[in-house]
Structures are given as C-alpha cells and as structure tokens.
C-alpha cells in the first residue's frame, strides 16, 4: 500500500571501493539567444523616460552572479533598490540606495518598477490588481513562464540577468534622479530601523558583520 519507503544500504556496499572513469561536466552556458535587441532598446527607452525609477532585485540576480552589473546599472539609472528574500546579497545592504525588502505598499510612488529576476509572489504583491498601480513595470527574467504570470508587465527582457544588465549598461547614459533619491533618503531618516542595542539580536549582529 502507498506510504513511506525505507531503502537500507548495507555497510559493505557503502564502504566498497571500485574503479571508474570520471566524466568532466560541461560548463553551462548562459542563455543569451533569447535576449532580443529590440527588447533591450525598449527597456532603455522606458528607463530614460522614468522620473521615479525603483529597482526590485530577486533570486535570479543571485543565481546569475550579477552583483557587479547590478551595481553599475543602479548607479546609471540613479535609483533606490529593494529586494526579495531570495534576492538578498545581490546588492550591498549597506549601500545608501538600499531600502530593504520590498513591502506591499513600498512601490506606491515609483513610476517605473524595474524587476531583476523576481517572480512577484503574493507576499510581495498582496492584491496584485493594486500592486504598483502608478508605475510601469519592466521585468528581466530567464524563465518565460514568470513573465506576466502574477503581474502584467509593460515591457520585459527574457534571458540571463547578468547578460541583460550588461547589455543595458552598454546602451544607457547616466540618469539624474537626485530629487527622487533625496525624497527616498528623507523616508529613511523619518522612519529609521530601531532595535535594542543593549542585548544581542539579529539586526545588531548583521550590522557588526557589515562594519
């Protein structure tokens, strides 16, 4: 009948020695064939038109090891950055542009949400119909199934995040959104993260590690 199955392997089998010819695994090539130049151009156009861009980083940026390209991209766009739980580590958490994890109401003021390798889970969007309702959405993702899955996008680029960011960086001039960045900084000053510094706790430990 259906149920748990235990496979018991004897010690003489697990400790046995044998000869074999190892196979050297082939390197996995990044998916670049799916990246269309017209999609890159459309993304660049949207970025240039934006006045209040916001970059949302997901696990795809971590998997593609896109940290360097992401940092350069964010500086060129001149935008604040947030991330998902899976996207943590792709962007420096001590950088002044970093605003923490994306919340359900944290994207209400941006006019362009640039999504790098994130999948719009319900813990991010809440009510998807009301998510980032004042913004156009530009999504970069390697998985076609994630495009327009939970949230409709205005434009997207399908492919490896590292390669997408590299190509856009090559075409994008430095943008100036100093007023927008000052506005974001004012929020960080008005609503700082507070925690008890007299006892050992997670945020304090991470702060010391960053230092």
Which functions belong to the PLM regions below?
Residues 183-211:
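Active-site diphosphate/adenylate-binding microenvironment
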Residues 9-14, 59-61, 144:
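Glycine-rich beta-alpha junction loops
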Residues 35, 48-113, 211:
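Anionic-ligand anchoring segments at beta-strand to alpha-helix junctions in alpha/beta enzyme folds, i.e.
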Residues 22-24, 67-78, 128-133, 155-156:
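Short, solvent-exposed amphipathic alpha-helical segments in soluble enzyme
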Residues 83-183:
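Glycine-rich, acidic loop regions that bind phosphate or pyrophosphate groups
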Residues 17-28, 183-193:
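Gly-rich Lys/Arg/Thr-decorated short loops/hinges at beta-loop-alpha junctions or inter-strand turns
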Residues 1-23, 43-46, 106-138, 171, ...:
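Structural signature of the thiamine diphosphate
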Residues 29-42, 199-201:
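A general structural motif
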């Amino acid at each position: 009948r259906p149920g748990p199955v235990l496979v018991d392997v004897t010690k003489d089998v697990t400790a046995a020695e044998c000869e074999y010819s190892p196979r050297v695994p082939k390197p996995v090539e990044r998916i670049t064939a799916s990246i269309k130049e017209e999609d890159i151009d459309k993304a660049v156009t949207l970025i240039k038109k934006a006045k209040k861009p916001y970059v949302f980083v997901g696990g795809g940026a971590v998997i593609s090891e896109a940290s360097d390209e992401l940092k350069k991209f964010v500086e060129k766009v001149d935008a604040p950055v947030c991330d998902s739980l899976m996207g943590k580590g792709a962007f420096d958490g001590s950088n002044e542009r970093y605003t923490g994890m994306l919340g359900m109401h944290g994207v209400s003021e941006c006019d362009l949400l640039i999504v790098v390798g994130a999948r719009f889970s319900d813990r991010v969007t809440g009510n998807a119909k009301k998510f980032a309702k004042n913004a156009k959405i530009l999504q970069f993702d390697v998985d076609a199934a994630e495009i327009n899955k939970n949230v409709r996008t205005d434009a997207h680029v399908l492919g490896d995040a590292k390669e997408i960011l590299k190509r856009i960086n090559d075409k994008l001039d430095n943008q100036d959104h100093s007023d927008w960045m000052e506005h974001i900084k004012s929020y960080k000053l008005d609503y700082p993260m507070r925690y008890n510094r007299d006892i050992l706790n997670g945020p304090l430990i991470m702060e010391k590690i960053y230092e």
